[in-house]
C-alpha cells in the first residue's frame, strides 16, 4: 500500500473498483492502522463491501529510494514481499503495486520466477489507438536490452495478448527509427532475425513511433 501518495489514494481507488466489479475480492497488505484509518472515511462503501476485502498487517514497507538488493535481503515482512508471496502461495491471482519498481521486479523474480525461456521480466503498458490498442514494452525494467532479451519480450507480449484478448496470433513489431531493415543498431537487427525465425511470433518488422497509434 505504498507508492508516491500511499493509502490516501490506493484505499479509495480500491473501494471504488470493488463497487464497480462485483466478482473481485481484494487483499490489502500494509500497515493495519493506516489502512483502517482510510477505510473509516468511506463508511457507506465499506458497509456494502466489507465481505469483499481483507487487510493483512505488514511490519515494514519498501521505500521508493531503496535498492532492490536490500529489499531482497531485508524486506521479507514488507507489504510488497507478502503481496507477491501471496501469488506464489496461490492465495491471490494478481498483485497491483504503486511502489518501488526495481524492488517489485527483484522480489517478483525471486518469488515467482520467469516462464520457461525467459530470463528477465519487462514492464508493459497498454496504449489506446483509433482501432483497439497497442502494448508497448519494455518501459523501464531493463536499462540495456540485447537482441535476445527483445526477442523474449516479444514472446511474453504475444502470449499475454493472446490470453487477454483471445487472439490466436497477435502481430508483433519492433520499434525503431525507421521501417527499413538496415535502420537501427545491431541488437535490433538480431532481435528482428530471432523474431522472424520464431514460429510462435507473428512478426511484422520494424515500425516507427507514429504506427503505435
Task: Report the location of each language-model feature.
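Short beta-strand segments
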Residues: 29, 54-56, 97-99, 126-127, ...
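Phosphate/nucleotide-donor binding subsite
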Residues: 44-92
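Short glycine-rich anion-binding loops that position phosphate/pyrophosphate groups of nucleotides
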Residues: 1-2, 60-61, 100-102, 110, ...
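Short coil/turn connectors at secondary-structure junctions
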Residues: 21-24, 50-51, 89-93, 100-101, ...
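Short glycine/serine/threonine-rich phosphate/pyrophosphate-binding segments
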Residues: 4-11, 35, 76-90, 94-108, ...
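Glycine-rich phosphate/diphosphate-binding loop of Rossmann-like nucleotide-binding domains
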Residues: 8-9, 21, 25-27, 143-205, ...
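N-terminal phosphate-binding or glycine-rich loops at protein starts, especially the Walker A/P-loop
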Residues: 1-37
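Short, acidic/small-residue loops that bind anionic groups at enzyme active sites
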Residues: 94, 105-140, 197-207
Amino acid at each position: 500500500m505504498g507508492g508516491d501518495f500511499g493509502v490516501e489514494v490506493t484505499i479509495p481507488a480500491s473501494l471504488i473498483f470493488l463497487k464497480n466489479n462485483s466478482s473481485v475480492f481484494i487483499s490489502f497488505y500494509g500497515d493495519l492502522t493506516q489502512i483502517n484509518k482510510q477505510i473509516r472515511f468511506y463508511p457507506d462503501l465499506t458497509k456494502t463491501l466489507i465481505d469483499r476485502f481483507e487487510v493483512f498487517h505488514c511490519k515494514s514497507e519498501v521505500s521508493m529510494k531503496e535498492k532492490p538488493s536490500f529489499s531482497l535481503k531485508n524486506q521479507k515482512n514488507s507489504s510488497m514481499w507478502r503481496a507477491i508471496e501471496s501469488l506464489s502461495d496461490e492465495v491471490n491471482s494478481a498483485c497491483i503495486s504503486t511502489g518501488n519498481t526495481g524492488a517489485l521486479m527483484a522480489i517478483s523474480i525471486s518469488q515467482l520466477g520467469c516462464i520457461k525461456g525467459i530470463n528477465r521480466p519487462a514492464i508493459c503498458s497498454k496504449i489506446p489507438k483509433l482501432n483497439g490498442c497497442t502494448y508497448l514494452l519494455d518501459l523501464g525494467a531493463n536499462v540495456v536490452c540485447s537482441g535476445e532479451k527483445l526477442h523474449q519480450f516479444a514472446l511474453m507480449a504475444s502470449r499475454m495478448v493472446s490470453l487477454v484478448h483471445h487472439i490466436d496470433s497477435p502481430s508483433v513489431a519492433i520499434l525503431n527509427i525507421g521501417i527499413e531493415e538496415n535502420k537501427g543498431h545491431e541488437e535490433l537487427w538480431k532481435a528482428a532475425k530471432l523474431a522472424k525465425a520464431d514460429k510462435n511470433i507473428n512478426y511484422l518488422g520494424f515500425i516507427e513511433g507514429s504506427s503505435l497509434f
